[in-house]
Amino acid sequence: MLVGIPTEIKNNEYRVAITPAGVAELTRRGHEVIIQAGAGEGSAISDRDFKAAGAEIVNTADQVWSEAELLLKVKEPIEPEYSRMRKGQTLFTYLHLAASKPCTDALLASGTTSIAYETVQTAEGALPLLAPMSEVAGRLSAQVGAYHLMRSYGGRGVLMGGVPGVAPAEVVVIGAGTAGYNAARVAAGMGAHVTVFDLNINTLRRVDGEFGGRIETRYSSSLELEEAVKKADLVIGAVLVPGAKAPKLVTNSTVAHMKPGAVLVDIAIDQGGCFEDSRPTTHDEPTFKVHDTIFYCVANMPGAVPRTSTFALTNSTMPYVLKLADKGWQAACASDSALAKGLSTHDGKLLSEAVAKDLDLPFTDAAQFLA
């Protein structure tokens, strides 16, 4: 199979969808790999590295898109890429379609077979291709929150860990999944007083046990969450409903009563965000103000640390990439129920029930294509 990897063109997206080790494994199995020149530079992987592993380096994105049978990306296609999508090609990438009707419409119009990293799900409910980037985004969220709390960047002028005689920052983390857990871990490591909210008592027990009570855990009720947010210096939203839009858990009226200079970091922005006022931002312009607070809603946070993110991501995606290349998408998905859950579109049909519900579009069960 011919596998293609274009350069990512989203704002400040420096990750790449494959490493030289992945190229070597694909070519060892008899597959061809073409990579757009410079695709790995942001992750400190040179064209020479890819070529030495067996890839062919091509000059343009158009050539990669037009020739590849299996196209690997990191982030969802954006408008300049819509016209390149085509029937007969399999696209394997993060999609987050519930938050993007234009991308969904473009995929359906093109007839492309698309499989979303973020909805590949095991029988136990694990999300193996979302987890590594959730770890990165969670850890980054505490760092960027601390950064924007500095007065010179519009924040309250609060140090996360405080100093002897001065209280540390109050940090509220909404959601104790992979991203929230990692956010809480780093924030607590910086010395902040951290409170984690979640609806799953067993998850809260795990957090409490692992941190020996150093992180406060609270069952998420509207009343208690609202009161905690109002008192917080930093709020990190890490809520996930796989494949669907994130629920809006922090309202504009609550934000209006927060401390001036408080910071809100919305990790869930890829899925529409979990704060009422959230809207996607970029690494170039990462923040905006609501009332007297600072919102940070960068939709590709891990793109800021591509050397770490690229290798973390591809360590998880490559087993699935190899299945798709070896068997084709139908046989691969028919033999792997986790991969099948990632199926999003095929031949103009929307195969994700959660996306169909959120965007009010017709849903088609993927099972009919896998029989």
UniProtKB/Swiss-Prot annotation:
Keywords: Cytoplasm, NAD, Nucleotide-binding, Oxidoreductase
Annotated SUPFAM superfamilies: Formate/glycerate dehydrogenase catalytic domain-like, NAD(P)-binding Rossmann-fold domains
GO cellular component: cytosol; plasma membrane
pH dependence text: Optimum pH is between 10 and 11 for the oxidative deamination and between 7 and 7.5 for the reductive amination.
Positions annotated as active site in the UniProt record: 96 (proton donor/acceptor), 270 (proton donor/acceptor)
Disulfide bonds: none
Induction profile: Induced by both D- and L-alanine under aerobic and anaerobic growth conditions, in exponential and stationary phase. In the absence of inducer, high basal levels of activity are observed in cells growing exponentially under anaerobic conditions (at protein level). Strongly induced immediately after deflection from aerobic growth.
Molecular function (Gene Ontology), one example: alanine dehydrogenase activity
Primary role: Catalyzes the reversible reductive amination of pyruvate to L-alanine. Required for proficient utilization of D- or L-alanine as a nitrogen source. May be required for the adaptation from aerobic growth to anaerobic dormancy. It could be involved in the maintenance of the NAD pool during the shift to an anaerobic dormant state in which oxygen as a terminal electron acceptor becomes limiting.
Family: Belongs to the AlaDH/PNT family.
Quaternary organization: Homohexamer. Trimer of dimers.
Protein name in the entry: Alanine dehydrogenase
Species name: Mycolicibacterium smegmatis (strain ATCC 700084 / mc(2)155) (Mycobacterium smegmatis)
Taxonomic lineage of the native organism: Bacteria, Bacillati, Actinomycetota, Actinomycetes, Mycobacteriales
Gene name, Swiss-Prot/TrEMBL: ald
